[in-house]
Amino acid sequence: MAKILAVNAGSSTLKWKLFDMPAEVQLAEGLVDRLGQPQSKVKIKYGDGQKYESDTPIANYQEAVASLMGNIKALGLVEHLHEITGVGHRVVAGGETFAESVVVDDATLLQIQNLRDYAPLHNPVEADYIDVFKKMMPWATEVAVFDTAFHQTMQPENFLYSIPYDYYKKYGARKYGAHGTSVRYVSARAAEMLNKPLEDLRMIVMHLGSGSSVTAVQGGQSIDTSMGFTPLAGVTMGTRSGDIDPSLVAYLMKKLDVPDVGQMIHILNNDSGLLGISGISNDMRDLEADEDTKPRAKLALDIFVNRVVKYVGSYAALMDGVDVLVFTAGIGENGDEIRDKIMRSLDYLGAKIDNDINYKSHGVEADLSTPDSTVKTLLVPTNEELMIVRDVMALS
């Protein structure tokens, strides 16, 4: 038996889950929050619903990892830290360099750092954390699992932008997508639920959360996805605009007197989407509560549904039909009203859901389809961390 950590690191947070493998039993999950602030927060759930919380200053990545390791031992999750034989790291951008998960050596770490332009807010932080784990747990196998890797099966007609081809060859300007680890997990799990080979299915995965994407999966491979060079593209999201005309960026910069493109991208990433349209919130639950009394709340919801439906329709056309629709992630797993609204517009595909089941299903696996539906509609809670530790086991 081996114990494997799955790590999701950000500039001010460190999220982790500890698994007993190969049994795939989750032993604990934790969060280090507000890193670098006077009162950082540590939260851990373990055992049979037990919780541990503390407020303590954690200044840097080294202290965050030391806190994680110390708490894992203090809570009796391991007797010796050497029981943890592997650590899997979520890495946002792998570019064309990485089409699958890899064991991290010094050369790999440098490659991840060199991809920082593809995800400047994420890759440098993730590379730094990998380096810290390598130094503090030198006995463990460190594995990088890339959000973009699953989408490396896309063909050029789906991943290239219609800009000068040299920009792709020289600068890597193309669609990379995101949420690949999530889509890989839920598509495989959906096939298992249906007791059918994944390779025989045409599937559309709707990963709907604060960040949302739609992915066409055919024969077990990603053939197209809504997110683009970065996760800013695609459907409307919580605070992200999704697809817009690039000329609008220059137009708004002039009108708003925004001096640099980075500031404009910040607006599109942080002040747009559901929040920007509604002027109320980026939280779907808040908008649903207000949709009958506040027109812009309803408008934001309508736009969100509209964009998802458009992508689903285009991907059904791309695959010459669809066998399975899958809802996952925070909104997809818990947003019964949003699922209902989306599915009302997909009846033409032969996809029908039983709303008695739909409105009772939250965060659990469920077949939402009616008996006469020719397209299956499934709710599959995502589990990126389990996918990550499986990759660690496979590479250890």
Swiss-Prot record:
Binding annotation for Mg(2+): 8, 384
UniProt xrefs under CDD domains: ASKHA_NBD_AcK_PK
Residues at which substrate binds: 90
Main location: cytoplasm
Gene Ontology CC: cytoplasm
InterPro entries: Ac/propionate_kinase, Aliphatic_acid_kin_short-chain, Aliphatic_acid_kinase_CS, ATPase_NBD
Cofactor binding note: Mg(2+). Can also accept Mn(2+).
Chain residues that bind ATP: 15, 207-211, 283-285, 330-334
Catalytic reaction equation(s): acetate + ATP = acetyl phosphate + ADP
Protein location: Cytoplasm
Any Pfam family the entry gives: Acetate_kinase
Family label: Belongs to the acetokinase family.
Protein name stated in the entry: Acetate kinase
Native organism: Lacticaseibacillus paracasei (strain ATCC 334 / BCRC 17002 / CCUG 31169 / CIP 107868 / KCTC 3260 / NRRL B-441) (Lactobacillus paracasei)
Taxonomic lineage: Bacteria, Bacillati, Bacillota, Bacilli, Lactobacillales
Gene (UniProt): ackA
